[in-house]
Regions:
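Aromatic-lined carbohydrate-binding/catalytic grooves of carbohydrate-active enzymes
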Residues: 60-124, 128-207, 211
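Carbohydrate-binding surface patches
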Residues: 319, 325-328, 333-335, 370-400, ...
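Catalytic cores of secreted or luminal carbohydrate-active enzymes
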Residues: 320-369, 596-597
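Structural recognition of the beta-strand scaffold that forms the well-ordered cores
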Residues: 29, 33-39, 69-74, 79, ...
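Glycan-recognition surfaces
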Residues: 161-166, 179-180, 186, 231-337
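C-terminal beta-strand-rich structural cap/linker in extracellular carbohydrate-active enzymes
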Residues: 582-605
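Bacterial Sec-dependent N-terminal signal peptides
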Residues: 1-20
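Gly-Asp-aromatic-enriched flexible segments
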Residues: 400-549, 581, 592
Length: 605
């Protein structure tokens, strides 16, 4: 492990907190849901200053007038040699100061040289009318503890404030700070004093809210921000935040995660309907349940998971995403690389009617949801008009379990693998399926050493081309995990297998005479190492596992009387078109996985 130690005192700007005349309730710092860009979905832990500036330039010239203004540098900006598809925990080169506070890696952020930190980059953004944000991990750096570095403004050291208990399972840069230890609050004060001096406007604090909600550290962070005198919007991560802490997080943060990492998966998007219903009553001005970043545009360029791609969401699914986020009033943090945006993506995220709903609507609430359709309603406080969002969420049943020739027990961290030995009796079809059990977070699974048997002969399934293959996140991979890493189950590495994420089905045409299939189904290390999710079931089918495909579109009927309307004028907010006057019922045809967003204006008879 290497690190760069910077001595404090290089710049006078670090010597005292930035005073900006901050007054009153911190909720006033985010009067509408924050809108911005975050580097995670496209650059993972490897983003550079040039890439941040390129996205800022695009935002300033094309998007700022629509309300997009936060530019957030995500995880591990203090590591000079991090990597995509995971984290470099083998020999990370940390940049850290003499008080145990991380500093930007100067090989990635050249303007930080000479102890200037992120101030030059923040100044660059501020001159463009933008706001600057960073991601940090909860706690105190492990390297600060190992070096027994002092806590600024005290006679104590990092050793006096830490505990190894409850260390983050998926990244080991930090130790827990024990709230009741002397020096604990002072350490948080010191890092936010530094961030305020840089000109920070937004902080995302990770490993703070799920699966353990660290009440004491949330409160210390809140106090440290208030002490700076600078309005720094606070976002907590990851999710789902335990809902029994909803009141506390609403009273201490501006936004908090309601889900785990959200990627361009329809199954994950569909899950948000349940999640947003659960969290709807906890939204308040300046306090927003967060549906996570928008995996739109070009993502996965050097991501922690996944390959470079334009979003896998169809256009209809993108309309669903933006319609749902706006009617729920979730923060909008764009995950793609702005310079790669196409005209459609820009039009989607700058639609003035959608953004009006996001910023101005009140009394937002679900109207109904069933297996096929959903609807939300809200009001315009300016004139009493209704905002109506409708969604066609119908799917075909992916796996009818009663059809399975074999299925495993629930595979989780306690029971992380199961052997498969199935007689096929000459079947010419084979479907390998993995289903989610409890939720869809980190359901990464591996088919290890999948082998077809024909008498005494064997054929590795990895040598055959599949007919069709799906994965709930990413894409199925041969001899690699779904995230692109090695196949690792229960700590053991394998060279032969298939990596997927639930829900997944891989279909094969088999050679004649195959009488047996063997394999091991196991939870992949990437999922097993997380704090949440990773509960799956393996299934093998010899016939089509799914049900019939739903129609390409469906009519959604809205009883206007249930909305307190007899007759109304309807405007399509996405297109801006006036659709006419409707009495008693409003009916509209919506594409599969698509959405509509409408303004309903009462018409007096």
């Amino acid at each position: 492990m290497k690190s760069l130690l910077i001595t404090i005192g290089v710049l006078a700007v670090y010597l005292s907190p930035a005073q900006t005349g901050n007054k009153g309730d911190f909720h006033n710092w985010a009067p509408t849901p924050p809108m911005g860009w975050n580097s995670w979905d496209c650059f993972g832990p490897t983003v550079t200053e040039a890439e941040v500036k390129a996205n800022a330039d695009y935002m300033a010239s094309r998007l700022r007038s629509s309300g997009w203004n936060y530019v957030v540098v995500d995880i591990r900006w203090y590591v000079g040699n991090d990597k995509a598809h995971g984290y470099n925990e083998k020999d990370p080169e940390y940049s850290i100061d003499s008080f145990g506070r991380y500093l930007p890696a100067v090989n990635r952020f050249p303007s930080a040289a000479g102890g200037r930190g992120f101030k030059p980059l923040a100044d660059y953004l501020h001159k463009k009318g933008l706001k600057f944000g960073i991601h940090i991990m909860r706690g105190v750096p492990v390297i600060a503890v190992k070096r027994n570095l002092p806590v600024k403004g005290t006679k104590l050291t990092a050793n006096d404030i830490y505990s190894p208990a409850d260390q983050c399972r998926w990244l080991h840069d930090m130790y827990t700070i024990v709230p009741d230890k002397a020096g604990a609050q002072e350490y948080y004060n010191s890092i936010f004093e530094l961030y305020a001096a840089w000109g920070l406007d937004f902080v995302k604090v990770d490993d703070l809210s799920s699966p353990i909600y660290f009440t004491g550290e949330v409160e210390m962070i809140r106090k440290a921000i208030e002490r700076t005198g600078r309005p720094i919007v606070l976002s907590t991560s990851p999710g789902e935040t335990p809902i029994d802490h909803a009141t506390h997080v609403q009273q201490h943060a501006n936004m908090w995660r309601t889900v785990g990492d959200f990627w361009d998966s329809w199954r994950q998007l569909k899950e948000h309907f349940k999640v947003f219903e659960r969290w709807n009553k906890w939204r308040a001005n300046g306090a927003y349940p967060d549906g996570d970043m928008l995996p739109l545009g070009k993502i996965g360029i050097r991501a922690e998971r996944g390959d470079p791609r334009m979003t896998n969401f169809t256009r209809d699914e993108q309309y669903t995403l933006m319609t749902l986020w706006s009617i729920f009033r979730s923060p909008l943090m764009f995950g793609g690389n702005f310079p790669d945006n196409d005209a459609f993506t820009d039009s989607l995220i700058t639609n003035k009617n959608m953004l009006y709903v996001l910023n101005k609507s009140i009394n937002n609430r679900p109207l109904f949801r069933n297996e096929k359709q959903a609807a939300w309603i809200a009001e315009d406080p300016a004139n009493g008009d209704k905002f109506l969002a409708v969604f066609n969420i119908e799917d075909r049943e992916e796996m009818i379990e009663s059809k399975a020739a074999w299925k495993s027990a629930v595979i989780n961290r306690q029971n992380s693998s199961e052997m498969i030995d199935l007689k096929l009796n000459g079947s010419r079809k084979l479907y390998l399926a993995v289903s989610s059990v409890e939720n869809i977070d980190w359901d990464h699974a591996d088919w290890i050493d999948p082998v077809l048997h024909k008498g005494n002969d064997t054929i590795s399934l990895t040598t055959l081309k599949w007919t069709k293959a799906t994965s709930g996140w990413g894409k199925p991979r041969v001899n690699r995990s779904v995230s692109g890493g090695e196949l690792i189950v229960e700590g053991k590495k394998y060279t032969s297998g298939l990596g997927v994420s639930a829900n997944s089905v891989i279909e094969y045409e088999l050679p004649e005479g195959i009488d047996r299939f063997t394999a091991m189904g196991g939870l992949d290390k990437a999922g097993a190492d997380q704090n949440v999710g990773a509960t799956v079931r393996f299934l093998v089918f010899t016939e089509q596992p799914s049900g019939p495909e739903p129609p390409a579109s469906a009519t959604i009927d809205i009883d206007l009387k249930e909305l307190g309307l007899q007759s109304c004028k309807v405007q399509d907010l996405w297109s801006g078109k006036q659709l006419g006057v409707f009495a008693d019922k409003f009916s509209v045809k919506i594409n599969k996985h698509g959405a509509g967003l409408y303004r309903l204006t009462a018409v007096k008879k």
